[in-house]
Regions:
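Short acidic, hydrophobic short linear motifs in intrinsically disordered regions
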Residues: 132-155
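Short, amphipathic alpha-helical interaction segments positioned at domain boundaries
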Residues: 194-210
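A short, conserved structural fragment
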Residues: 172-184
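Short, amphipathic alpha-helical "recognition" segments used to contact nucleic acids or chromatin
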Residues: 125-133
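Intrinsically disordered, low-complexity, charge-biased tails
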Residues: 1-4
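Long, low-complexity, charged/polar intrinsically disordered regions in eukaryotic proteins
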Residues: 8-13, 21-122
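Minor-groove-contacting beta-hairpin "wing" of winged helix-turn-helix DNA-binding domains
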Residues: 184-196
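Short amphipathic alpha-helical interaction segments
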Residues: 155-173
């Protein structure tokens, strides 16, 4: 339920706050007695940044009825408990950036590639294919979409399929796509995937209808 997602986000933000407080306390104590290190400072900065990011992009989003739906469907499709989902997301910033970009895109009603968020905004490729009602696709097709967007922005193109594969892996974990067994090779850019037309897919299709 959406209520359990709000509660889970609150629990995980409390955990992150504890870590940030502890890291800050450690740094301050070490600073006072002259034993502080670069690592102490880096740990404190990383922990406080993580907490702020989670509050701004997840906690605030789940309190908004419309935006909470992104996490609701993503968590439902991933078949994870909400707390586990959020903890995993915080350890995999690559995935979280994409989900957060998706949330922001739903708020604005459009999902496009952005030079301001080159990692998160790659999720546009997924939305483009859903909008075009494509049933099956290859990792090479995702790679091409990403490079078309980068070319339009006049920035360096991807040389290999790593970024395309990472986006597809996230979509697999979220229960949005599945690999077509025995069809193509990921290394050659010919591995085939198909969309799973579940609640999450339908939600995304509705959210970005032209």
């Amino acid at each position: 339920s959406k209520k359990s997602i709000v509660e889970a986000a609150s629990i995980v933000s409390d955990e992150l706050r504890e870590k940030a407080d502890l890291a800050t306390q450690t740094y301050n104590e070490h600073y006072k007695n002259g034993t502080h290190t670069k690592a102490d400072k880096a740990n404190m900065q990383a922990a406080t940044t993580k907490l702020a990011y989670f509050i701004n992009n997840v906690v605030n989003a789940v309190e908004d009825e419309k935006l909470c739906s992104v996490f609701y469907y993503a968590i439902k499709a991933s078949k994870q408990a909400p707390e586990v989902f959020f903890r995993d997301a915080m350890t995999n910033s690559y995935s979280l950036e994409k989900l957060v970009y998706l949330v922001k895109s739903i708020k604005s009603g459009k999902c496009t590639y952005s030079v301001a968020d080159m990692s998160g905004s790659r999720v546009f490729a997924l939305i483009d294919m859903i909008n075009d009602e494509i049933d099956t696709f290859t990792n090479g097709a995702v790679f091409d979409l990403m490079n078309e967007a980068k070319k339009a922005c006049e920035i360096k193109l991807d040389a290999g399929y790593t970024q395309a594969n990472q986006l597809i892996n996230l979509c697999e974990r979220l229960g949005l796509v599945e690999k077509v067994k025995g069809a193509g090779s990921a290394k050659a850019g010919t591995q085939q995937y198909r969309f799973i037309k579940n609640d999450f897919y339908n939600y995304l299709a509705d959210a970005f209808k032209a």
